[in-house]
């Protein structure tokens, strides 16, 4: 039986150095920071496939501070600044909660209205303070749709589609036409 290929997923970006021992501040880009940056976890630098093994991590003033076994001093930490950190995951690995979705599984899904008419595709997911927002490409125009059940009643990853409520102007090319 053929093994399934893995998918590279961004989990963080290295910010500034913290202290003299090689610790770095990580801008978290994952819903599972404690698992992805727990002691013993391994991440890679995007593009280089260089492994970094977490030896310490802690939260301080809302920032994740991480020490990697391969980085011994501040100079090594400074060299990592700006590096994007990735992990390999199974492509069909989904959250346990049926109402949660990984961004990578939503990108590219076809967006249809309640009548089934194709309206565009999910381009990205923005994580805002109030709620997540879908960026939907409609004929080359980006439309922002709050990712809430009232506006997005159905998400069917298996069939590759999302249903968006038919609110006038929400996905219209020219919002003025909806008035």
UniProtKB/Swiss-Prot annotation:
For this protein, the record's Pfam families field holds:
PRC_RimM, RimM
Keyword presence, Cytoplasm:
yes
**Subcellular compartments:** Cytoplasm
Do you know which InterPro entries this protein is assigned to? PRC_barrel-like_sf, PRC_RimM, RimM, RimM_N, RimM_N_sf, Transl_B-barrel_sf
The GO molecular function terms of this record are:
ribosome binding
Picking any one GO biological process from the record gives:
ribosomal small subunit biogenesis
- Entry keyword set: Chaperone, Cytoplasm, Ribosome biogenesis, rRNA processing
Q: Where is the PRC barrel domain?
A: 98-170
Q: State the superkingdom.
A: Bacteria
Signal sequence segment: none
Q: Which SUPFAM superfamilies match?
A: PRC-barrel domain (SSF50346), Translation proteins (SSF50447)
- What is the stated purpose of this protein? An accessory protein needed during the final step in the assembly of 30S ribosomal subunit, possibly for assembly of the head region. Essential for efficient processing of 16S rRNA. May be needed both before and after RbfA during the maturation of 16S rRNA. It has affinity for free ribosomal 30S subunits but not for 70S ribosomes.
What UniProt notes about the protein's domains is: The PRC barrel domain binds ribosomal protein uS19.
UniProt cross-references to NCBIfam families, sorted A to Z: 16S_RimM (TIGR02273)
Query: What family does the database annotate?
Result: Belongs to the RimM family.
Record's subunit section: Binds ribosomal protein uS19.
Q: What is this protein called?
A: Ribosome maturation factor RimM
């Amino acid at each position: 039986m053929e093994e399934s290929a893995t998918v590279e997923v961004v989990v963080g970006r290295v910010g500034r150095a913290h202290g003299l021992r090689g610790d770095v501040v990580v801008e978290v880009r994952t819903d599972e920071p404690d698992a992805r940056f727990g002691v013993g976890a391994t991440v890679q630098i995007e593009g280089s496939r260089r492994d970094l093994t977490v030896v310490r991590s802690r939260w301080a003033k809302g920032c994740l501070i991480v020490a990697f076994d391969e980085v011994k001093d501040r100079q090594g930490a400074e060299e990592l600044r700006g590096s994007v950190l990735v992990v390999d995951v199974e492509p069909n690995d989904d959250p346990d909660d049926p109402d949660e979705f990984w961004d990578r599984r939503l990108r590219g899904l076809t967006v249809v209205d309640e009548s089934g008419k194709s309206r565009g595709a999910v381009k990205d997911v923005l994580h805002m303070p109030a709620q997540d927002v879908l960026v939907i490409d409609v004929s080359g125009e980006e439309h922002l749709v709050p990712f809430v059940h009232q506006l997005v009643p159905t998400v069917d990853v298996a069939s590759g589609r999302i249903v968006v409520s038919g609110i006038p102007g929400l996905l219209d090319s020219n919002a003025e036409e909806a008035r």
